[in-house]
Regions:
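Cytosolic regulatory regions of ion transport systems
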Residues: 1-197
């Protein structure tokens, strides 16, 4: 049994679709996305499995629902068939990939934005058909790298130029490497992948 299901025997909340956007997971990643979308006037339907976390969010006026967002019946109740966007922000690599596969297979016109736990996970999600993938620590790492360059004596403009160029090259290489990545082969044993890294 997944660890999060053992936390509570509470039944799933009944869901009345609140918008054309479903956010699966409302932790430190999904919560920021939901706040940003809400501040721009977008109604969302949020599904999370942390009962205590959701009760706290309700006190701040967020529309949240308890349940396992990877369950097809719960997604259907949330209105996935009419949704414009599914944001997958849960913190479980295997569950994210599973949900991406299900959503894109069942709803091929749905835009899926998926959280990637690490670089290898980006490739798994790419292989599953997702094309809008966000590495959870990527942007903060770029900012930290820029700060490190400044701490080493580069002026802010030079540090920004280096960080921007690194990001441009890294983003350009991602689809190329994703197409060479093999789920059944460790990256260091995949000669075509290694040749491009």
């Amino acid at each position: 049994m997944p660890h999060y299901l053992a936390r509570s025997t509470r039944p799933d909340d009944p869901i009345e679709p609140g918008g054309k956007i479903i956010i699966a997971g409302h932790g430190r990643f999904g919560g920021i996305i939901n706040r940003m979308l809400s501040s721009a006037g977008h109604a969302t339907t949020v599904i999370d499995y942390s009962s205590e976390h959701l009760e706290a969010l309700r006190t701040f006026g967020f529309q949240v629902h308890f349940g396992d967002a990877t369950r097809p019946d719960l997604l259907q109740a949330a209105g996935i068939a009419e949704a414009r966007l599914l944001v997958i922000a849960i913190n479980d690599k295997a569950k994210i990939t599973e949900l991406v596969r299900y959503a894109l297979h069942t709803y091929p016109d749905l835009h899926v934005l998926a959280r990637a736990i690490d670089r290898d996970h980006v490739y798994e999600l790419w292989a599953a058909g997702c094309r809008d993938i966000v590495r959870e620590t990527y942007d903060s790492s770029i900012r930290a790298g820029r700060s490190a360059l400044q701490a080493l004596g580069l002026n802010p403009r030079q540090a920004t130029r280096i960080a921007d160029e690194f990001e441009r090259l890294d983003r350009a290489s991602m689809p190329v490497l994703a197409n060479l990545y093999r789920l059944d082969t460790p990256p260091h044993l995949n000669a075509p992948y290694v040749a491009k890294v």
